[in-house]
């Protein structure tokens, strides 16, 4: 892997020039040249995983110190890897079959493209210059994720359906909330599945390691989103806070409805993609030859979630909803398993 200057598609009019200018400043702080030494790359990777604010004392949600810490974390943990020169390893026929069979590629590429648009659109509505710049950087990084995925599918000959046209969202805040919460859900389960793939050896370690920076970057993204939520909530007047919380509830309902609709669409005979609508559950069998139960997968997701967040300042907020639900499911599952075990005796 190497370090790179950013490339932004200037044909996309929404704040593209602002994103390019801001992220370019991040690159000028690092080493120059097309390729960096292994030591520099390792240092950049390490910096992306460990960060503590220089601000002493409590980081009270909504305070200026909290805001400065959030934005500094995102800026200072930036990892300038270059998608265009990622070394995609050669796969044998069985490894290639496994990779192509993963039912995620169309959705993954489209999701990153939509996230880029939604984040950039919301950035335009943010008055605070620090938060605006950080959300613009997030939009740029979403675009980089799409580049990584596009290069991967091209390298391995994975065919994708034509992408739908992405339109500027009519309600940028709604789009930002839906995207942020959706990423928080998907990343939680992706952490566990990714580690399962690493442990199983089902895919070459070179491929897993090549994709690792993207996984950690997703952790940074949802860490920022969780803290943006805390900061935003704390700075709303009480009547706007009520409206916002009702909107958050509506977002969760909307996401659930989208997932149900996606499942129905993928189960239909007309679906050419034949993608698995329950990949989070069944996906474990696609990345390991060993049978993995749902509760075991939940435990692994929790462990990986905790591990990836462990390097960041403990005073920053963490995503709580999905981990709490996973712990509840684990608790109920263990209780039920124990109850059945006692009855069997």
Name these PLM-found stretches.
Residues 179-238, 245:
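Glycine- and acidic-residue-rich phosphate-binding/metal-coordinating active-site segment common to enzymes
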Residues 108-116, 138-153, 179-190, 214-225:
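Alpha-helical transition-metal enzyme core signature, strongest for iron centers
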Residues 147, 151-154, 158, 223-230, ...:
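Charged/polar positions within long, soluble alpha-helices
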Residues 146-198:
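Active-site-adjacent scaffolding segments
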Residues 1-133, 155-162, 169, 234-238, ...:
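Terminal targeting/low-complexity segments that flank the catalytic cores of oxidoreductases
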Residues 133-137, 209-212:
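Short, charged, amphipathic alpha-helical segments
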């Amino acid at each position: 892997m190497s370090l790179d200057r950013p490339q932004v598609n200037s044909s996309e009019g929404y704040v593209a020039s602002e994103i390019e200018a801001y992220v370019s400043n991040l690159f000028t702080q690092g080493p120059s040249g097309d390729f960096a030494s292994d030591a520099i790359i390792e240092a950049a990777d390490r910096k992306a995983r460990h960060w503590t604010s220089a601000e002493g004392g409590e980081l009270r949600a909504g305070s200026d110190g909290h805001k400065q810490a959030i934005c500094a974390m995102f800026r200072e943990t930036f990892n300038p890897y270059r998608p265009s020169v990622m070394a995609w390893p050669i796969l044998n026929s069985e490894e290639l079959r496994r990779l192509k069979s993963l039912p995620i590629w169309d959705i993954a590429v489209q999701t990153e493209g939509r996230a880029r648009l939604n984040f950039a659109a919301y950035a335009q509505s943010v008055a605070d210059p620090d938060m605006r710049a950080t959300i613009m950087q997030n939009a740029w990084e979403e675009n980089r994720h799409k580049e990584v995925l596009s290069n991967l599918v091209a390298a391995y000959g994975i065919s994708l359906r034509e992408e739908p046209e992405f339109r500027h969202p009519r309600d940028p805040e709604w789009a930002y909330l839906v995207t942020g919460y959706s990423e928080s859900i998907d990343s939680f389960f992706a952490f566990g599945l990714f580690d399962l793939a690493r442990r199983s050896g089902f895919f070459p370690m070179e491929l897993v390691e090549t994709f690792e920076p993207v996984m950690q970057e997703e952790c940074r993204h949802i860490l920022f989103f969780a803290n943006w939520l805390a900061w935003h909530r704390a700075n709303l007047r009480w009547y706007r806070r009520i409206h916002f919380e009702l909107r958050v509830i509506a977002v969760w309902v909307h996401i659930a409805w989208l997932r149900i609709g996606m499942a129905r669409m993928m189960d239909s005979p007309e679906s050419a993609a034949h993608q698995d609508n329950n990949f989070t559950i069944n996906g474990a069998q696609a990345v390991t030859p060993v049978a993995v139960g749902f509760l075991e997968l939940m435990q692994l997701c929790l462990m990986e979630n905790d591990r990836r967040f462990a390097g960041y300042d403990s005073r920053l907020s963490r995503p709580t909803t999905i981990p709490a639900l996973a712990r509840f499911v684990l608790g109920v599952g263990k209780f039920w398993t124990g109850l059945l075990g006692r009855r069997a005796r």
